[in-house]
Amino acid sequence: MKKFLDKDFLLSTEAAKELFHKYAEKKPILDYHCHINPEEIAKDRQFENISQLWLGSDHYKWRQMRSCGVEEKYITGNASDSEKFQKWAETLEKAIGNPLYHWSHLELRRYFGYEGVLNGETAKEVWTICNEKLREKSMSARSMIKQSSVTLICTTDDPVDNLEWHKKIKEEESFDVQVLPTWRPDRALNIEKPGFKDYIARFSEVSGVNITSFKTMKEAFRKRLGFFISSGCRTTDHAPEYIMYVPSSDKEVETIFDKRLSGVALSKEEELKYKTAFMLFAGGEYSKNDLVMELHYGCKRNNNTLVFDKLGPDTGHDCIDNFAPGAQLSNFLDALDSAGQLPRTIIYSLNPNDNAVIGTILGCFQDSSALSKIQQGAAWWFNDHKPGITEQLTSLANLGILSNFVGMLTDSRSFLSYTRHEYFRRILCDLIGSWVENGEYPYDVKILSKIVSDISYDNAVRYFKFKL
């Protein structure tokens, strides 16, 4: 029987062990998509206790606590931090097979030096150990980033953000990790949302463009995008329910935009026509400015109306959606490609059933401008576990070129989540090692070491054109 979480955790062959320990493990981390708050980096936040660091905004953990019948006051309510931690520890011991069990114990070992197991009985001991450690300067926000060997972080930012914290981080000479903004204009895309009109007013104010039409909205978009680029932005992100393609004329879109600003409700077809026009315009701008376009879709958000009304979004009430027509995704990419405006694109679906669809679409739009110009994104959110990661890697290998894959990202709000890169690299090396062990690929260490090193770090540096 193997020891829990030993040095060869998830590594089942000699080839896997060699590839991980000699190569993948030694690569630094490039976190090109996350939800870290740049203000906490700029202020070098020192967390008071492990609950603030672990449970403050982690809806992954909140979902499991609710599944164990924990009262909401111990999750997002006014219970003490120590009580919340106790409830989490009692939940964790039941989470066999869940990646949170692995992530949590990896974090305890890598950052706090705790080699034991967290459960209801050990919660007080772990609480004390972690909180004593968190008082040290070596556990401030920046210090945790540095000790994780992170070289670059891309946050997720709205076009109206002033990026003041990114600027302050850049001016800090003692901190050499790049923290770059990511352009995420979802609120300008979501024309059907109740707050759209107010958001456009804010967008108008910040951009200095009087937005009265789709044409002037595009002018404001270009202006703010230019500001983001001047602040180091190299990638963009969109999170629609799915990638739609319902083309229309410029005149139609102007009419739809004017109708919405006038307070008139839109039909579903009008909504889709606007979103298609918006995304085609956005993709063209990204191509002109040599930016990467990331597309995250396949999520149905805020499913529990009662809880949403109390707690708001991002509290653990989202799920996988199974409506994502591959034909519309393909038509969208084709429209951009036909206009000579298809940027480097990473496609993520939250639904694992879309892996093969995405894998076959990728091959239709590759060209010599980049290695795997159109990429399938890493398994994320509800798929960010051993079977989900393995399935995504295997599908990509079956249908494309795994060696060109840009690899892992945390997609997280936590400064401890960099262990997810280790988790991913172990699974990657184990998968490749199994192919070698089974005689499906030669044991050529020179080639294999380059493949795992590239996927772990180097491909992302090249693909996004980061200057490191």
From Swiss-Prot:
Q: Which domain of life is it from?
A: Bacteria
Q: Which reaction does it catalyse?
A: D-glucuronate = D-fructuronate; aldehydo-D-galacturonate = keto-D-tagaturonate
Q: Which pathway is this protein engaged in? A: Carbohydrate metabolism; pentose and glucuronate interconversion
A single GO BP: D-glucuronate catabolic process
**UniProt xrefs under InterPro entries:** Metal_Hydrolase, Uronate_isomerase
The beginning of the lineage is: Bacteria, Pseudomonadati, Elusimicrobiota, Endomicrobiia, Endomicrobiales
Which named protein is this?
A: Uronate isomerase
The species is Endomicrobium trichonymphae
HAMAP family to which the protein is assigned, alphabetical: UxaC
- Enzyme Commission number: 5.3.1.12
Q: Does the keyword DNA-binding apply?
A: no
NCBIfam families for the chain: PRK02925.1 (NF002794)
Encoding gene per record: uxaC
Q: Does the keyword Isomerase apply?
A: yes
Q: Which UniProt keywords apply?
A: Isomerase
Could you state a single Gene Ontology molecular function term? glucuronate isomerase activity
PANTHER family of this UniProt entry?
Answer: URONATE ISOMERASE
Q: Which family does it belong to?
A: Belongs to the metallo-dependent hydrolases superfamily. Uronate isomerase family.
